[in-house]
Regions:
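The feature encodes the CheY-like receiver
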Residues: 17, 59, 87
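Short hydrophobic/Thr-rich beta-strand motif most characteristic of the beta2 strand and flanking loop
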Residues: 28-35, 43
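Acidic catalytic/metal-coordinating carboxylates
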Residues: 35-36, 62-65, 83
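Short amphipathic alpha-helix used as the core "switch/output" element in two-component signaling
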Residues: 42, 64-76, 93
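The short loop immediately C-terminal to the conserved phospho-acceptor aspartate in CheY-like receiver
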Residues: 52, 56-57, 78
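C-terminal output helix
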Residues: 89, 107-117
């Protein structure tokens, strides 16, 4: 594994990637942002990531399918699910199927940074949460 934690961030809402990509880069993650789950899946087939952050509900493919693919092909990868408040039961189901953690929308970038730091520690890596600097 390189020094930087490799993160794939998938959410069909453009603002999520726009805000969270730079927030994660500040703590030492190398982030690839996707809005299209099909494109994200194609990338996952070519590259292994340390952490995958995915929305559960998307149009073409849902986050549960991404979770299942990652679990089958890269069991070391930690998957963090993003969900709306109305989908907490679905997030719990994702945890039962092997997701590392989940975050309910709306959330702050610091909330995701904390979960990323926890996932990095579980992988034996680290990110510098304190270098995040100013809140977003």
């Amino acid at each position: 594994m390189s020094d930087m934690v490799q993160v794939l961030l998938l959410d069909d809402e453009p603002i999520v990637g726009k805000r969270l990509g730079p927030a994660l880069a500040k703590i030492g993650c190398e982030v690839e942002v996707f809005q299209d789950p099909i494109a994200a899946l194609a990338r996952l087939k070519k590259k292994s990531f340390d952490i995958v952050v995915t929305d559960i509900r998307m149009d073409e493919m849902d986050g549960m399918q991404i979770l299942e693919y990652v679990n089958e092909t890269s069991p070391r990868t930690k998957v963090i699910m993003i969900t709306g408040y109305a989908m907490i039961a679905l997030a719990r189901e994702a945890m039962e199927k092997g997701a590392f953690d989940f975050i309910a929308k709306p959330f702050k970038p610091d909330d995701l940074r904390r979960v990323i730091a926890k996932a990095a520690m579980a992988l034996g890596a680290s990110v510098d949460f304190t270098s995040a600097g100013e809140p977003l």
